[in-house]
């Protein structure tokens, strides 16, 4: 079995490996609430543009 046959051969239909950030394709720190599907770093960058307001 060569590398081409083994690379990404495992099915990724659920779990962390199946989801990624819609902005930067990162798989860590993903915020899925409200269908955001953004990592926390990108969320902080785009939160104001999306319409989120930081409360005191």
UniProtKB/Swiss-Prot annotation:
Major subcellular site: cytoplasm
Keyword Glycoprotein: no
Disulfide bonds: none
Cofactor note text: Binds 1 zinc ion per subunit.
GO biological process: cytoplasmic translation
Gene Ontology cellular component annotations, sorted alphabetically: cytoplasmic side of rough endoplasmic reticulum membrane; cytosolic small ribosomal subunit; ribosome
Gene3D superfamilies reported for this sequence: 30s Ribosomal Protein S14, Chain N
Classification via PROSITE patterns: RIBOSOMAL_S14 (PS00527)
Binding site for Zn(2+): 21, 24, 39, 42
GO MF term list: structural constituent of ribosome; zinc ion binding
Xref: InterPro entries: Ribosomal_uS14 (IPR001209), Ribosomal_uS14_CS (IPR018271), RIbosomal_uS14_euk_arc (IPR039744), Ribosomal_uS14_sf (IPR043140)
Pfam families listed in its UniProt record: Ribosomal_S14 (PF00253)
Location(s), subcellular: Cytoplasm, Cytosol; Cytoplasm; Rough endoplasmic reticulum
Key words of the record: Cytoplasm, Endoplasmic reticulum, Metal-binding, Ribonucleoprotein, Ribosomal protein, Zinc
Cofactor: Zn(2+)
Function: Component of the small ribosomal subunit. The ribosome is a large ribonucleoprotein complex responsible for the synthesis of proteins in the cell.
Protein family according to the UniProt entry: Belongs to the universal ribosomal protein uS14 family.
Quaternary structure and partners: Component of the 40S small ribosomal subunit.
Name of the protein in its database record: Small ribosomal subunit protein uS14
Organism annotation: Hippocampus comes
């Amino acid at each position: 079995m060569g590398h081409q046959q083994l690379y990404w051969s495992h099915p990724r239909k659920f779990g962390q490996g199946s989801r990624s950030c819609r902005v930067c394709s990162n798989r860590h720190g993903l915020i899925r609430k409200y269908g955001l599907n953004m990592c926390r770093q990108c969320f902080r960058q785009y939160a104001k543009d999306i319409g989120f307001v930081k409360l005191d």
